[in-house]
Each structure stands twice: as structure tokens, then as C-alpha cells.
């Protein structure tokens, strides 16, 4: 039931976001806090959000910290649609075995749309595969 409510809020927020000008999500460093699985099976709370950040820069680049790695992608933002070009440079450090770096980057690269609600950023993945939930410090 909570996902139905979240889905309705996301749809309403998408409609409102499409009406806006420059997006409020640009220029903020967001910390990945959780993954919400639409099937409610693989929900995940990120134990150390400060190690998984996303900053959408004014110049169209995305600065990403994926635990022990730094990544730079480009992004396209059109209304509530958000997509990443995942071919940018990245460090290739070997993170700890329990790191979420690979999951984070794979899911981030599958972003389709976003919703900003009450200071929380939701990145909605393609094919209704779930949502990445971000807060700002």
C-alpha cells in the first residue's frame, strides 16, 4: 500500500516538475539513502550514504562518488526526465567486499525520471525497476 501512495505522489510530482524551469536538483550534492524495489522484495537502506553521492553540475556533468571510486558522467535533464551517459572517466579502485559501488552505478545508470519532494530526491528507474532515494546533508 505504501508503494501505491508513493507512486501516486510521484505521478503528481512529475506533472508539477514538468511545469518548472531550471531544476532544483542541479548544484546540490545528494547522498544515496535507500533503494525502493517496486516488488518490495529487495528494499535496501544504505548504511553509509556519505560514501555514495551525486552532484548534477550546471555544465551538464555529474560528479559521482561510488564508495571508494570517483566517476564523472554527463546527464540530460528535460522536465522530469533524467538520463546519464555512463561512458565518462572513473577511478578503478577495488572497494571493500561489502561495498554497494557496483549496485549504485548500475542503478544510477538506469535512471529514467526524477521527483523532488520535501527535500528528498527520488530517481525512478526504467521499466518500473525501483527508485533510488537521495537526501541532501
Which sequence ranges carry the predicted segments?
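Lipid interaction determinants
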Residues: 5-9, 14, 19-137
